From Swiss-Prot:
Domain Rieske intervals: 88-203
Residues that, per the record, bind [2Fe-2S] cluster: 128, 130, 162, 165
Pfam families noted in UniProt: Rieske, Ring_hydroxyl_A
Name this protein carries in UniProt: Putrescine 2-hydroxylase
Amino acid sequence: MRITTPVNPDGVQFPVWDRPDRFFFAPERHERHDLSRPGFFIRAEGIMTDIGRMAHVVPARTQLPVSAYFDEARFAREQELIFKQSSLYVGHQKLVPELGDWRTLVQEDGGRALVRNQRGVELVSNVCRHRQALMLGGEAGNVSGNANTRGSLKDTGGNIVCPLHRWTYNDRGELLGAPQFDATPCMNLQRFRLRDCHGLLFEGPRDPAADMAPLFARPEFDFGDYVLDHVEVHQCNYNWKTFIEVYLEDYHVGPFHPGLGRFVTCDDLAWEFNDWYSLQRVGVHQALAQPGSAVYKQWHDRLLDFRAGQAPDFGAMWVTYFPTHMIELYPHVLVLSTLYPKSPQETLNVVEFYYPEEIVAFEREFVEAQRAAYMETAIEDDEIAERMDAGRKALMLRGANETGPYQSPMEDGMQHFHEWYRRVMGETED
């Protein structure tokens, strides 16, 4: 993102978009600011500028037509132009922490699996080369669903063994034996290249470590002592872009989320934008003194108990690595949430919950309270997204198209996403 910084008569610089009809703060609306007070910050290409808390409306020139959320042809183009050209999150190394551990990819109905071997973590096909059966995971009546998705090769002598005919592969997918064949066929499992970004594993043509280098230079993004506690698989009956839009706007947090809206405050919202990601940081609402729901009260209480009554330094940090990977930081919590679009109106959300090892081992109530609060907000977000797509569908069916303005700074992240989307799709503004 490129910004310019014109100087007003008082000599104070204000960032302005590189087109005259798009701005964060117009010099003609200027009033003198005390730069020492908290405010809203936006960082772009190394520039950090205070532009105060003065909200304004930005014209909706980059928003998408209502048909974009339902069109099968567009969905197919997205697969080619976005998903095949991006870094796609596969899983974290900590999903398979011990030698011999395996975990099938639920987002692919178990068709591939992460396996930890002497070389590290590898991604291999979970489909036997003999009769193309799924091997690891699953159970009778649910062979490809979210059941029995992890285990250890120690149970099968360190090897991957097909349950149908006992074809046996080593932990790298190399065929060791095929019963009652005169010679072992040269038929190994396919392996897939992974790119490691501080333990997060991606595949695709981009380099996620380079894309997110400024992000992982921040001390908050060191998760060395965190361990996996739980993986939630959540079905979303709306378009993947709608999910990202809701995630990237804070305008609804106060009005729609009674629990989250009393856990965080958007009064000190700060954005950081980069070519392939955005980061939003929000503060703590009144030192957690007024929980907004019964579920969030449990989370407030457990968090304050763990911190001996001391309120945390921040409420949340929400990252979106385009197109669909989200890194969410809460006090003593890491959540990795990733969308896997299945159709224009069907999206799978796989959510991984990580905590410091000490909390997982000794603070079960903390873990359960945080996850319950998170899922309460997730269900509320589902309603927002479902209402948005239902309204868009109603407009589309009557042959109409409507888009509203962006509220700035609350919806700057949504605007940034729309700009990125149009760029990679090769589309111009409406």
